[in-house]
Each structure stands twice: as C-alpha cells, then as structure tokens.
C-alpha cells in the first residue's frame, strides 16, 4: 500500500472516530468490533459514493441552470456576481475558497426558485461538503475548476443555457477527475 493511500485511510478513519492520534505517542484504535469494521468498509466505498453523488448532481444541475437562466432576477444575478468576484479574488490570492465555492453553488440552487429541487440538491451537497472538508489526500482540491465558476456566471448572466450547461459539465469533469485520482 502506498503512503498516500495509507495517509488517506488514516485521515478518514480518524475523522470517523475509529482512530485517535495522540501527539508524541502514536495512533490508537478508539473503537473495536463491528463498528470499526463498518467504518473500514465504508472507507473503501468512499470515493465511489462521492462519484455516484457527483453523477446525480450533474443531472440535477443541468436543469437547475436552465431554471436559473429563466427565473433569476437581475438583483439575484448581481448577488451571484458578488459571490463570484469574491471567489475569484480568493483564488487569485491563493487563499482557501471552499466556503465561498459552496456559497456560489448554493446561490445557484436557490435561484432556480424550485424548493423541492433545492432541497434535493442540498441534501446531496451534505455528502459532498463532508468530502470537501476532509478531502481524501487532496492537498488543494478542485483548484482547476475555480476559473470555470466565473465563466459559468457570465454564461448565466448572458442567459445562454447551452453555454452555461457546457461550462458546468467541464467544471464537474474537473472535480470528477480529481476525485478519481
């Protein structure tokens, strides 16, 4: 087993409470029996689960983008523009932008003006956010996708459904590629 794979496994098991790192002493198993085995089995499925959720997200976001283009007001698009500007500013300054990235997508979901769709996509986002917060051995995850957010915003602003959907596909392709590695 390679060191990065082992580090990845250790991180996940630690965040799930199966392992505990004690400075100067080592790493210890905190739970035994079935629970730690279930956690271990869940870890092996982690990336595939995230990829499955990403696939559903891809399907839903295609329709969400169409709805946003037809339903969002100018004022709402201005708000999305402010979030986009902040995201790009943090990106260009080399600062973490995970929370602003999440806000960007959440804003798009809200601008669909479809409560059922919003609740569905945000329930999927809960799974994705846990991955963003504890990326599986990814140092600076999804940086290649950040510039595409600005392009997506401009395509939405132009009310160009096909272009916006295409850019969003590229954005999700980048995310999928990094997860798959």
Predicted regions and their residues:
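Short linear motifs at protein or domain termini
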Residues: 1-59, 66
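Short arginine-rich
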Residues: 173-181
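Structural signature of alpha-solenoid helical repeat scaffolds
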Residues: 137-140
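Conserved amphipathic alpha-helical segments that form helical-bundle/coiled-coil interaction surfaces
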Residues: 56-134, 144-150, 155, 163-174
């Amino acid at each position: 087993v390679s060191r990065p794979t082992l580090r990845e496994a250790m991180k996940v098991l630690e965040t799930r409470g199966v392992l505990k790192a004690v400075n100067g002493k080592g790493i210890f198993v905190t739970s035994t029996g079935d629970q730690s085995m279930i956690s271990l089995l869940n870890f092996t499925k982690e990336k595939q689960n995230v990829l499955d959720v990403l696939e559903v997200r891809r399907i839903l976001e295609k329709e969400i983008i169409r709805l946003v283009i037809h339903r969002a007001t100018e004022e709402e698009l201005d708000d999305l523009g402010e979030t986009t500007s902040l995201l790009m500013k943090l990106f260009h300054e080399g600062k973490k932008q995970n929370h602003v990235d999440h806000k960007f997508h959440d804003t798009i979901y809200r601008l669909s003006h479809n409560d059922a769709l919003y609740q569905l996509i945000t329930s999927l986002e809960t799974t994705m956010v846990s991955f963003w917060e504890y990326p599986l051995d990814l140092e600076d995850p999804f940086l290649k996708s950040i510039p595409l957010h600005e392009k997506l915003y401009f395509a939405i602003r132009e009310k160009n459904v096909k272009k916006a959907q295409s850019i969003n596909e590229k954005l999700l392709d980048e995310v999928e590629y990094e997860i798959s590695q």
